[in-house]
């Protein structure tokens, strides 16, 4: 059985790139358009991993991470921020919320796959 990764990003083109990259690597992908949509999908089924953008409407990535970490069935899943933000203060905020890692856009597809393989052995 392949592992499922939930991706949250308000950019349709970015969701497409991330999903295609992960599907080509053998993962199942569920897409969410923002943090609120991601939480709704998490209430249906817990993924093995979450990849989220930082800046999204309705609920940003930091708040999404905080809320995901409060869910008993998602408390320990790996969460990776995939964002244009690269400032140390933002990374610290992400870590404090519960992010497992941080990838800065633009990214190389193989970089995303390597991170997924590392966090989902």
Predicted stretch roles:
Residues 16-24:
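Charged docking surfaces used in two-component/phosphorelay signaling
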Residues 31-49, 92:
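Acidic, metal-coordinating helix/loop segments flanking the phosphotransfer/catalytic sites
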Residues 46-48, 73-78:
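His-Asp phosphorelay/catalytic-motif detector in bacterial-type signaling
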Residues 53, 83:
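Active-site residues of response regulator receiver
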Residues 56:
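Receiver (REC) domain active-site loop signature in two-component systems and cognate sites
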Residues 107-116:
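C-terminal output helix
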């Amino acid at each position: 059985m392949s592992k499922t990764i939930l991706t949250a990003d308000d950019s349709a083109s970015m969701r497409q790139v991330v999903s295609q990259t992960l599907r080509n690597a053998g993962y199942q992908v569920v897409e969410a358009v923002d943090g609120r949509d991601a939480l709704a999908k998490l209430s249906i089924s817990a993924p093995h991993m979450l990849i989220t953008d930082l800046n999204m409407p309705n609920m940003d990535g930091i708040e999404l991470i905080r809320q995901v970490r409060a869910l008993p069935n998602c408390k320990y899943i790996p969460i990776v921020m995939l964002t244009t933000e690269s400032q140390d203060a933002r990374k610290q905020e992400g870590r404090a919320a519960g992010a497992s890692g941080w990838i800065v856009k633009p990214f190389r597809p193989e970089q995303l796959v390597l991170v997924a393989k590392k966090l989902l052995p």
